[in-house]
Swiss-Prot record:
UniProt KW keywords: Cell inner membrane, Cell membrane, Membrane, NAD, Quinone, Translocase, Transmembrane, Transmembrane helix, Transport, Ubiquinone
Domain of life from the UniProt record: Bacteria
Species for this entry: Francisella philomiragia subsp. philomiragia (strain ATCC 25017 / CCUG 19701 / FSC 153 / O#319-036)
Subunit structure: NDH-1 is composed of 14 different subunits. Subunits NuoA, H, J, K, L, M, N constitute the membrane sector of the complex.
Function, in words: NDH-1 shuttles electrons from NADH, via FMN and iron-sulfur (Fe-S) centers, to quinones in the respiratory chain. The immediate electron acceptor for the enzyme in this species is believed to be ubiquinone. Couples the redox reaction to proton translocation (for every two electrons transferred, four hydrogen ions are translocated across the cytoplasmic membrane), and thus conserves the redox energy in a proton gradient.
Enzyme Commission number, as recorded: 7.1.1.-
Protein name: NADH-quinone oxidoreductase subunit K
Keyword field contains Lyase: no
Family to which this protein belongs: Belongs to the complex I subunit 4L family.
Pfam (any one): Oxidored_q2
GO cellular component, one term: NADH dehydrogenase complex
Membrane topology, as annotated: Multi-pass membrane protein
InterPro entries: NADH_UbQ_OxRdtase_chain4L/K, NUOK/Mnh_C1-like
Compartments where found: Cell inner membrane
Amino acid sequence: MNSISVSVTNGLIFSTLLFVISVAGIIINRRNILILLMSIELMLLAVNTNFLIFANMHHQAMGGVFVFFIMAVAAAETAIGLAIVVAIFRKRKTIDLSKLNTLRG
């Protein structure tokens, strides 16, 4: 085992910690859209880390391929989400979700 390889246990602990932090970010701060988007991206990072760890453990390249496609979808999701946030901010002058609960035009 070389010095840069990560054990499966340490990788899973890291991935679980990332996922728990992102869930806590969603639960604690439900009002700010940007925090919610960042927490969702952190969840996807935790899932990607799991794919890479298990792919490395089983010596398969498919985990890296899955991570590539997940990152592409996450980038598109982030771009669309930020565009929606900018449009909402221009229209309402706030991104606080508690003030955006009405469906006015």
